[in-house]
Amino acid sequence: MALKRIGLQTVELPLRPAISASAAYVGRKEGEGPLGALFDHVAQDELYGQETFELAEKRLYLDAIRKAIQKGGLQPENVQFLLGGDLLNQIITASFSARELGIPFIGLYGACSTMAESLCLGGMLLDGEHASTAVCAASSHFCTAERQYRYPLEFGSQRPPTAQWTVTGAGAALLCLEPSVPPLAHIARICMGRVVDLGVSDANNMGA
């Protein structure tokens, strides 16, 4: 059996699954940045019309997925897999969103690599002809991530100048073997990374 591998970490996808559509829903701070005009929607407050930050993140996640599917000319029932995750315990944003969407779900936790991981695995699913459609998604929310990894906002801790600012937003991409709209790109190869410990232990200076 010929393996679809190139070197140690790269896999070739001969069927070249298409990224037929994508969507991004973000918070106000992200909308004020240089990419602001490119997002599908910018929420004007951190709660996004919800009662908690966690519910706000879930709404961003669902909206991004539904928008990507719509832009790809499909309905949720036409999507055969949802691959995605977030930064919270039990990947609750992705899990509860999957429950609402009813799409077969593969939950992923790769922290900052979750979106790329979902595209790699989704591409392999389609190239292996185990599915013809899949949606890949990832999200985070500044207020939920601060509670998870640093200090809850209500604690009032002072942030050092080097502290990272976790994105409030969700992104989704629809993969298809036979897209019904002109594709944005094709996944021809994927390269899986390795874990490299650089010895950075300061949670407030992760870019050191």
Model-predicted regions and their roles:
Residues 19, 54-113:
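Conserved beta-ketoacyl condensing-enzyme motif
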Residues 35-38, 94-105, 126-128, 149-158:
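A glycine- and small-aliphatic-rich helix-loop capping segment at beta-alpha/alpha-beta transitions
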Residues 20, 84-85, 134-140:
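Short beta-strand segments
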Residues 14-17, 30, 55-63, 77, ...:
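Conserved active-site and cofactor/substrate-binding residues in soluble primary-metabolism enzymes
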Residues 91-92, 142-147, 194-199:
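Short, well-ordered, mixed-charge alpha-helical segments that flank or form enzyme active sites
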Residues 1-52, 151-208:
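Condensing-enzyme catalytic core mediating Claisen C-C bond formation in acyl metabolism
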Residues 109-136, 175:
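Active-site-proximal alpha-helical scaffold in enzymes
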Residues 70-75, 124-133, 176-184:
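Secondary-structure boundary elements
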